[in-house]
């Protein structure tokens, strides 16, 4: 995933209202009105959030004039989740090694460089 | 991510900030440290190379933002990519809390530094893996495009 795309995705997700909108869309399409309902903010404010999500490719909007249903686009989210998972594994394994290293040092076994004898 | 290590805080902090010690554990299973150059102080930079089991070298580099022994370490990191440029820059914050003879280490990593600066979030915006991953898991657990990843 390109750094820019990742940036855009995370920036879009950095707002709790937008995260809640995405969570709602996970259960199916909705209109702007339906999405605005749970929040104490104006329709134009919700529309602004939807624009950010749309630009990030996280939602797509239908074209019918009156009714422009919003739906979730899972691609960028999936990529973000994979990125997170990749790093979680990376650090998890590093910390396993750190744990092992700390044990060795305290038993007086390891050298500082961790070289095998 | 949080881990509890059976070691005193000073040692755990040293494991992160003494270059020879870092070389002993940094990186996924099977990786070895090939080269490292670390200037561990606020504003200092580092470069670090690790080699995968199949012989591919990965360089990373960054800047230390805070080095507060033995409780807090903050640094950026980015992978050096093909043409010598840098990939996504990330900010890592590690804190160390003593729990008796043990140490509770809390680790946060986020790609949000650039975003935080741009959007002017005063204190910066970092995210723990767990909070974000939890959000994804709970929000989308019923969605066909699940974000679960098999171990």
Task: Give the location of each predicted region.
Chain B
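A structural signal for short, well-ordered beta-strand segments
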Residues: 1-3, 64, 94, 107
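A short, structured loop/turn motif at beta-sheet edges
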Residues: 9-10, 40-41, 65-72, 95-104
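Hydrophobic pocket/interface hotspot
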Residues: 12, 22, 46-48, 64, ...
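A conserved amphipathic terminal alpha-helix motif
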Residues: 111-151
